[in-house]
Structures are given as structure tokens and as C-alpha cells.
């Protein structure tokens, strides 16, 4: 039934539970599991050298989250995508581009401080997704 399952992952407890569900679904269906982690762009108004430092920290954090997702799901690096942008938009673009048959994500994320999913991001994905969305609490 499912050929490609997209896991939206932000490192929150909800996302960790979603990772377990996505992994199980991928195994049950013999599907490819793709992990997407979206991070917010650094505001331009920071200026040098603050912009460079903020970008470096944001990328380091994103790499850490990706590594955690890879460890939880067993997906190879080429199937663990880091995308810059608003989480919902990045997830939706990845789902379309990768022809996802199912999106799995937590119902809530880490919030704006972590520059990751909010409940509103989950709602946007559900409303605009090109495929079914499985929300995990």
C-alpha cells in the first residue's frame, strides 16, 4: 500500500514516538522511509558576525537532530533530509518531491524556541498534504 513514508522529525518526544510508528509502518509495508527535518532560516537582520555564528549553531543543531533520527529509524544519510524553511512548507514540498504515500509526524513539537514544529504546523500539513497524514501523540 505505501511505497514511500515520510517522517517529519524535530527531536521532540512526540517526534520520537512518531519515528517508532513510521519505522514499524515502513517495515510492515516494505516501504522506503524518508526522514525530513526542517529548520528556520537565520534572520538577515542579525548582520555579521552574528549571522554567521547563528547559522553555524542552527546547522549544528539540525545535524544533531538528523543523526538522532537516523539512529532511531535506521535510515541512511541520503534518506535523512535537512531542509531550511518553515516546517510545514518544507514537509509538504518534500512529500510532493519524493512522492510520499504517507506522512508521519508528532502532534506537537518543540515550539518556536527550537525553531521546529508547532501544533499549527501539524494542522497545516494535515490541511494541505498530497497524501494521508498519520499524527502520533
Swiss-Prot record:
InterPro entries, per database record: Rossmann-like_a/b/a_fold, Universal_stress_UspA, UspA
Taxonomic superkingdom: Bacteria
UniProt similarity note: Belongs to the universal stress protein A family.
Protein name stated in the entry: Universal stress protein in QAH/OAS sulfhydrylase 3'region
